[in-house]
């Protein structure tokens, strides 16, 4: 990763499927309070300046096309530990929908908790799947169903959103062609609804003879 974070590999010693209701019954439900609600590490002004620099010097000069500029938000939770982490995990399971993977991982020195909408790549019995996602339509702020439909149609017709989705599909198709000996199949576009927003997405499918480690490389 560009920030220097080392890669971590999870080796599963036990895998088990349980009904969601049973899992929720087993998970704690502790109060979550903040010792410090914190804020963004980068101010709005500095972030806007960084975006402008990337547009002018990277995208504008042909050095890149699909770039994501990170912005970290830091806060401190009171009495943080296993029970609080599992409570956050529980709330994601209860309140988020449409996630590809809802996870809670403890590495020994940090927790990784989230609900990701996107599968980068999966391989099962030689079947490769990729899931390029783009576009974010927020469901908040629409008073009626008719208003939401009108805003969604305008969002889907926006050239910026259309080209951005094409761009991420093109990038992942290039990767698919490198690992799949027969090329890839493009399915979509689709809408991916979640609890508070809707994404646009494609599904890519292909077959590979490569070892999973080579696919990840």
Question: Where do the protein language model's features map onto the residues?
Answer:
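Non-catalytic accessory segments adjacent to catalytic cores
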Residues: 1-79, 83, 161-163
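Phosphate/dinucleotide-binding and metal-coordinating scaffold of catalytic cores
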Residues: 54, 110-111, 192
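A short, flexible low-complexity segment enriched in Lys/Arg and Gly/Pro that occurs
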Residues: 34-45, 136-138, 143-145, 217
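Short, well-ordered alpha-helical packing segments
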Residues: 52-55, 89-93, 153-156, 173, ...
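Conserved hydrophobic core element of enzyme catalytic domains
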Residues: 202-217
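Cytosolic ligand/metal-binding cores
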Residues: 2-22, 122-200
């Amino acid at each position: 990763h560009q920030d220097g974070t080392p890669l971590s590999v999870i080796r599963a010693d036990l895998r088990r499927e349980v009904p969601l209701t049973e899992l929720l019954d087993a998970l704690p439900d502790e109060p979550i309070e903040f010792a410090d609600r914190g804020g963004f590490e980068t101010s709005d002004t500095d972030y806007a300046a960084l975006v402008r620099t990337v547009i002018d010097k990277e995208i504008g000069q042909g050095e890149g096309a699909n770039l994501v500029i990170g912005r970290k938000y830091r806060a401190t939770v009171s009495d943080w530990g296993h029970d609080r982490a599992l409570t956050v995990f529980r709330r994601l399971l209860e309140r988020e929908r449409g996630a590809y993977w809802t996870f809670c991982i403890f590495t020994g020195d940090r927790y990784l908790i989230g609900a990701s909408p996107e599968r980068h790549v999966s391989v099962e019995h030689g079947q490769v799947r990729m899931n390029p996602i783009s576009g974010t339509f927020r469901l908040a702020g629409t008073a009626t169903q008719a208003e939401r439909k009108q805003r969604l149609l305008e969002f889907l017709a926006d050239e910026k959103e259309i080209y951005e989705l094409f761009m991420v599909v093109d990038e992942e198709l290039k990767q698919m062609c490198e690992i799949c000996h027969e090329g890839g199949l493009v399915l979509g576009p689709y809408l991916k609804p979640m609890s508070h927003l809707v994404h646009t997405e494609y599904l890519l499918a292909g077959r590979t003879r490569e070892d999973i480690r080579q696919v990840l490389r």
